[in-house]
Amino acid sequence: MIARIASDEVLNKCKPIQGWMYDDELLWLYEQARKASLIVEVGVWQGRSTTAMCLGTTGIVYAVDHWQGSPEELANAHSIMQTGTGRSEVMTKAMQNLMEMIDQGKCVPLIMSSERAADFLRPILADRGGADMIFLDGAHDTDSFRSDLLKWKELISPIGLLCGHDRHWPGVSEVLAEVLPDTQKGPGSIWFYDGGIQ
Protein backbone atom coordinates (compact mmCIF):
# COMPACT_ATOMS: atom_id res chain seq x y z
CA MET A 1 0.00 0.00 0.00
CA ILE A 2 1.14 3.53 -0.69
CA ALA A 3 1.16 6.24 1.94
CA ARG A 4 -2.29 7.66 2.53
CA ILE A 5 -2.98 10.99 0.86
CA ALA A 6 -5.01 13.52 2.82
CA SER A 7 -8.67 13.70 1.77
CA ASP A 8 -8.39 17.34 0.78
CA GLU A 9 -5.42 16.54 -1.49
CA VAL A 10 -7.37 13.75 -3.23
CA LEU A 11 -10.30 16.11 -3.75
CA ASN A 12 -8.04 18.95 -4.92
CA LYS A 13 -6.73 16.69 -7.69
CA CYS A 14 -10.14 15.27 -8.68
CA LYS A 15 -12.65 18.09 -8.34
CA PRO A 16 -11.27 20.36 -11.09
CA ILE A 17 -12.01 17.51 -13.55
CA GLN A 18 -15.52 17.68 -15.00
CA GLY A 19 -17.69 14.80 -13.85
CA TRP A 20 -20.61 13.69 -11.71
CA MET A 21 -18.91 12.15 -8.67
CA TYR A 22 -19.44 13.74 -5.27
CA ASP A 23 -16.69 14.14 -2.68
CA ASP A 24 -17.74 11.14 -0.57
CA GLU A 25 -17.89 8.95 -3.68
CA LEU A 26 -14.42 10.03 -4.83
CA LEU A 27 -12.95 9.37 -1.39
CA TRP A 28 -14.65 5.95 -1.27
CA LEU A 29 -13.10 5.04 -4.64
CA TYR A 30 -9.70 6.24 -3.44
CA GLU A 31 -9.94 4.08 -0.29
CA GLN A 32 -11.07 0.99 -2.21
CA ALA A 33 -8.29 1.46 -4.76
CA ARG A 34 -5.72 1.40 -1.93
CA LYS A 35 -6.55 -2.32 -1.55
CA ALA A 36 -6.26 -3.12 -5.27
CA SER A 37 -3.34 -3.55 -7.65
CA LEU A 38 -5.29 -4.11 -10.87
CA ILE A 39 -8.40 -1.99 -11.44
CA VAL A 40 -10.67 -1.67 -14.46
CA GLU A 41 -12.91 1.35 -14.91
CA VAL A 42 -15.61 1.24 -17.59
CA GLY A 43 -16.82 4.74 -18.46
CA VAL A 44 -14.15 7.37 -17.91
CA TRP A 45 -15.61 10.59 -19.34
CA GLN A 46 -12.91 13.15 -18.43
CA GLY A 47 -11.14 11.08 -15.77
CA ARG A 48 -12.46 12.36 -12.44
CA SER A 49 -13.09 8.94 -10.86
CA THR A 50 -10.09 7.48 -12.70
CA THR A 51 -7.85 10.01 -10.97
CA ALA A 52 -9.21 9.06 -7.53
CA MET A 53 -8.45 5.39 -8.16
CA CYS A 54 -5.01 6.09 -9.65
CA LEU A 55 -4.12 8.11 -6.55
CA GLY A 56 -5.08 5.17 -4.34
CA THR A 57 -3.54 2.19 -6.08
CA THR A 58 0.08 1.09 -6.29
CA GLY A 59 -0.86 -0.78 -9.46
CA ILE A 60 -2.67 -0.03 -12.71
CA VAL A 61 -6.06 1.34 -13.65
CA TYR A 62 -7.27 0.26 -17.09
CA ALA A 63 -9.49 3.17 -18.14
CA VAL A 64 -12.04 1.91 -20.69
CA ASP A 65 -14.07 4.31 -22.82
CA HIS A 66 -14.80 4.66 -26.52
CA TRP A 67 -15.61 8.34 -26.02
CA GLN A 68 -18.55 8.09 -28.42
CA GLY A 69 -21.16 8.81 -25.75
CA SER A 70 -23.61 6.50 -24.04
CA PRO A 71 -27.24 6.22 -25.20
CA GLU A 72 -28.38 8.60 -22.44
CA GLU A 73 -25.65 11.10 -23.34
CA LEU A 74 -26.52 10.96 -27.03
CA ALA A 75 -30.21 11.51 -26.22
CA ASN A 76 -29.40 14.79 -24.44
CA ALA A 77 -29.79 17.58 -26.99
CA HIS A 78 -27.53 19.85 -24.91
CA SER A 79 -24.72 17.33 -24.61
CA ILE A 80 -21.27 18.13 -25.95
CA MET A 81 -21.55 14.77 -27.72
CA GLN A 82 -24.14 16.35 -30.04
CA THR A 83 -21.49 18.61 -31.59
CA GLY A 84 -19.33 17.47 -34.45
CA THR A 85 -16.21 17.66 -32.29
CA GLY A 86 -17.72 16.35 -29.04
CA ARG A 87 -15.91 13.01 -28.99
CA SER A 88 -12.49 14.46 -29.71
CA GLU A 89 -12.98 17.29 -27.20
CA VAL A 90 -13.97 14.98 -24.35
CA MET A 91 -11.32 12.36 -25.15
CA THR A 92 -8.60 15.01 -25.47
CA LYS A 93 -9.60 16.51 -22.13
CA ALA A 94 -9.55 13.05 -20.52
CA MET A 95 -6.04 12.37 -21.84
CA GLN A 96 -4.85 15.77 -20.60
CA ASN A 97 -6.36 15.12 -17.17
CA LEU A 98 -4.82 11.65 -16.96
CA MET A 99 -1.42 12.40 -18.55
CA GLU A 100 0.49 12.45 -15.26
CA MET A 101 -1.00 9.07 -14.26
CA ILE A 102 -0.32 7.66 -17.74
CA ASP A 103 3.30 8.86 -17.58
CA GLN A 104 3.68 7.20 -14.16
CA GLY A 105 2.39 3.90 -15.57
CA LYS A 106 -0.64 3.98 -13.27
CA CYS A 107 -3.27 4.50 -15.99
CA VAL A 108 -3.66 2.63 -19.25
CA PRO A 109 -6.43 4.11 -21.43
CA LEU A 110 -8.23 1.56 -23.59
CA ILE A 111 -10.05 3.47 -26.32
CA MET A 112 -12.62 0.83 -27.21
CA SER A 113 -16.06 -0.41 -26.27
CA SER A 114 -16.67 -2.12 -22.96
CA GLU A 115 -17.29 -5.42 -24.76
CA ARG A 116 -14.03 -5.24 -26.75
CA ALA A 117 -12.09 -4.24 -23.63
CA ALA A 118 -13.48 -7.21 -21.68
CA ASP A 119 -12.38 -9.55 -24.47
CA PHE A 120 -8.98 -7.82 -24.70
CA LEU A 121 -8.32 -7.97 -20.95
CA ARG A 122 -9.71 -11.50 -20.41
CA PRO A 123 -6.34 -13.32 -20.88
CA ILE A 124 -4.46 -10.75 -18.79
CA LEU A 125 -6.98 -11.02 -15.96
CA ALA A 126 -7.23 -14.82 -16.23
CA ASP A 127 -3.46 -15.14 -15.73
CA ARG A 128 -3.71 -13.36 -12.39
CA GLY A 129 -7.05 -14.74 -11.17
CA GLY A 130 -9.14 -11.69 -12.07
CA ALA A 131 -9.21 -7.96 -11.42
CA ASP A 132 -9.01 -6.72 -7.84
CA MET A 133 -11.58 -4.01 -8.54
CA ILE A 134 -13.93 -3.26 -11.43
CA PHE A 135 -15.86 0.02 -11.48
CA LEU A 136 -18.78 0.20 -13.94
CA ASP A 137 -19.96 3.67 -14.91
CA GLY A 138 -20.58 3.38 -18.65
CA ALA A 139 -24.02 3.32 -20.25
CA HIS A 140 -26.92 3.18 -17.77
CA ASP A 141 -29.74 1.91 -19.98
CA THR A 142 -30.99 -1.59 -19.14
CA ASP A 143 -29.56 -3.50 -22.09
CA SER A 144 -26.13 -1.84 -22.08
CA PHE A 145 -25.71 -2.10 -18.32
CA ARG A 146 -26.82 -5.76 -18.30
CA SER A 147 -24.25 -6.51 -21.00
CA ASP A 148 -21.50 -4.71 -19.05
CA LEU A 149 -22.35 -6.36 -15.75
CA LEU A 150 -22.55 -9.88 -17.18
CA LYS A 151 -19.27 -9.47 -19.12
CA TRP A 152 -17.26 -7.87 -16.34
CA LYS A 153 -18.49 -9.91 -13.38
CA GLU A 154 -16.79 -12.90 -14.98
CA LEU A 155 -13.46 -11.05 -14.80
CA ILE A 156 -13.38 -10.03 -11.14
CA SER A 157 -11.24 -11.96 -8.68
CA PRO A 158 -13.28 -14.20 -6.33
CA ILE A 159 -12.26 -11.83 -3.53
CA GLY A 160 -12.38 -8.69 -5.66
CA LEU A 161 -14.67 -5.68 -5.50
CA LEU A 162 -17.24 -5.17 -8.25
CA CYS A 163 -18.77 -1.72 -7.97
CA GLY A 164 -20.31 1.07 -9.96
CA HIS A 165 -22.09 4.40 -10.01
CA ASP A 166 -25.64 5.67 -10.48
CA ARG A 167 -27.54 2.85 -8.74
CA HIS A 168 -30.63 5.07 -8.79
CA TRP A 169 -30.88 4.99 -12.61
CA PRO A 170 -33.77 2.67 -13.57
CA GLY A 171 -31.66 0.51 -15.92
CA VAL A 172 -28.92 0.06 -13.34
CA SER A 173 -31.23 -0.67 -10.39
CA GLU A 174 -33.33 -3.12 -12.42
CA VAL A 175 -30.32 -5.12 -13.60
CA LEU A 176 -28.65 -5.13 -10.18
CA ALA A 177 -31.85 -6.49 -8.59
CA GLU A 178 -31.99 -9.21 -11.23
CA VAL A 179 -28.32 -10.21 -11.54
CA LEU A 180 -26.76 -9.26 -8.16
CA PRO A 181 -29.60 -8.91 -5.65
CA ASP A 182 -27.19 -8.77 -2.68
CA THR A 183 -25.56 -5.58 -3.92
CA GLN A 184 -24.79 -3.09 -1.15
CA LYS A 185 -25.11 0.68 -1.15
CA GLY A 186 -22.02 2.82 -0.83
CA PRO A 187 -21.90 6.60 -0.44
CA GLY A 188 -24.00 8.70 -2.81
CA SER A 189 -25.08 6.55 -5.72
CA ILE A 190 -22.25 3.99 -5.45
CA TRP A 191 -23.20 0.30 -5.44
CA PHE A 192 -20.85 -2.58 -4.68
CA TYR A 193 -20.63 -6.33 -4.44
CA ASP A 194 -17.66 -7.48 -2.40
CA GLY A 195 -16.21 -10.93 -3.15
CA GLY A 196 -17.78 -14.32 -3.72
CA ILE A 197 -19.17 -13.30 -7.09
CA GLN A 198 -18.32 -16.42 -9.09
Language-model segment annotations:
Residues 4, 9-18, 26-198:
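S-adenosylmethionine/decaboxylated-SAM
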